[in-house]
Amino acid sequence: MQEIPLNAVPNQRLRVSLGGDEWELTIKVARTTMCCDIKRNDVILLQGIRVVPNQPLIPYRYLSGNGNFAFITENDELPWWEQFGQSHSLIWWGEND
């Protein structure tokens, strides 16, 4: 399992190499919740998914490939950008975790 650093800003895009794949996540505010777009190796997997705490971001095993992401929060709070890097973090885990 690996923590992915996030900035405490409302909208951001990040690219990381994990599990032999190139991932691109776009995290953005959608009114009072956070949404996410996910690409793996420049292929769009998901767009506009609502981010919920302590659950895999990619809900389908066949799309997740060699790993998956999740937002870990205190007290099952909905992930919110102002708490990134404090009590809300993004993690990735691979097949061996």
Residues of each region from the PLM?
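Compositionally biased, intrinsically disordered low-complexity segments enriched in polar/Pro/Gly
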Residues: 1, 39, 43, 76, ...
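Short, charged/polar N-terminal "headpieces" of proteins
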Residues: 1-24
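Cysteine-centric segments in proteins
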Residues: 7, 22-24, 61-97
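Solvent-exposed, flexible loop/coil residues
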Residues: 8-10, 27, 55-56, 75
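Generic "edge-of-domain/loop-turn" microfeature
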Residues: 11, 23, 32-34, 43-45, ...
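Generic recognition of long tandem-repeat/solenoid scaffolds
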Residues: 15, 36, 90-91
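A generic beta-sheet turn/junction motif
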Residues: 18, 29-31
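Acidic, aromatic-enriched beta-alpha/helix-loop junctions
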Residues: 31-73
